Amino acid sequence: MASALTTQGTAITMKQLLEAGVHFGHQTKRWNPKMKPYIFGARNGIYIIDLQKTVGLARGALRFVSDAVAKGGMVLFVGTKKQAQDAIREEASRSGQYHVTNRWLGGTLTNFKTVKQGIDRLKTIEKMAADGTYERLPKKEVAQLEREREKLEKNLGGIKEMSRLPAAIFVIDTKKEHIAVHEANRLGIPVVAVVDTNCDPEGIEYVIPGNDDAIRSIRLFTGKIAEACIEGRARYSTWAAQHGEERRPGEEDRDAASERGQKDRRDRRDRRGGGRDRERREPREDRAAASANVEVVRKGEVTPAQPAPGSDANR
């Protein structure tokens, strides 16, 4: 099934990126050299991310997510830092996907069988509360069960309906969520992530260079991924209605997705520093916006974004 990101919700433009402050990286002294291909330059001690590359890579990531969901897969949204929690929770819920916002439990993917036991326990307690079992138990025991339920809900509530491994994971801040990325890599699950100038892009099949601290930037990318999921689900529903059966992504789907991720990384390496390929890939209006952005940076008119509440003030 061919991808068709045609709706306004999944479109991403240079203007949106600029308004959200996506181009502001970290201080030059806090960078990861592996992010050099995605950096336009530095201004006032802060790295400026090449938004022209961000636009192209983001569009590729959105196409992949839409295709994965259209095949019956699910996406796990991961973002446990304070400024990402609300956006991750809201957008994952809106698009009917899974999410982790409290903390990543080691083995969530690689030891899912054990994690599933915790999920089953949570559902059991919820059933006890709903069917009147609580009314027949001593108050002390009910209080203990409620404390257990609250703890399980806090850690596992976002993946309560996850009966199998996701087709992909979407991550905000790969440096903080390195364990999640590592587990996904071990299982061959493609990783889509917003990667800032202080992060390591290795192991990320779909790198989206951008500010992973500013709330507006986080909400922009999380919302776009959610829209891609919604579009993918609509395509899946259409297919299921036409064929009268349900598709479930098997191991071959994840292998194919992993191969696509490896090919995508090779393509990105080939494109690094290549302006002609980039011009063929980008619409004319985005190239014009990129030129305007470059001119603003050269004139020194870039003003560093204010740190988001709860974020590191020394970016």
Swiss-Prot record:
In Gene Ontology terms, what is one molecular function of this protein? structural constituent of ribosome
One Pfam family here: Ribosomal_S2
Superkingdom classification of source: Bacteria
> Region labeled Disordered — which residues?
241-315
Query: Is Ribonucleoprotein found in the keyword set?
Result: yes
- Gene Ontology CC entries for this record: cytosolic small ribosomal subunit
Its signal peptide is none
Report any one BP term from Gene Ontology.
translation
Keyword entries, A-Z:
Ribonucleoprotein, Ribosomal protein
Compositionally biased, Basic and acidic residues: which spans?
A: 243-288
Give yes or no: UniProt keyword Translocase.
no
Q: List the disulfide bonds.
A: none
Which PANTHER family has this protein been placed in? 30S RIBOSOMAL PROTEIN S2 PROKARYOTIC AND ORGANELLAR (PTHR12534), SMALL RIBOSOMAL SUBUNIT PROTEIN US2M (PTHR12534:SF0)
Question: Would you identify the family this protein belongs to, as annotated?
Answer: Belongs to the universal ribosomal protein uS2 family.
Q: This protein is called what?
A: Small ribosomal subunit protein uS2
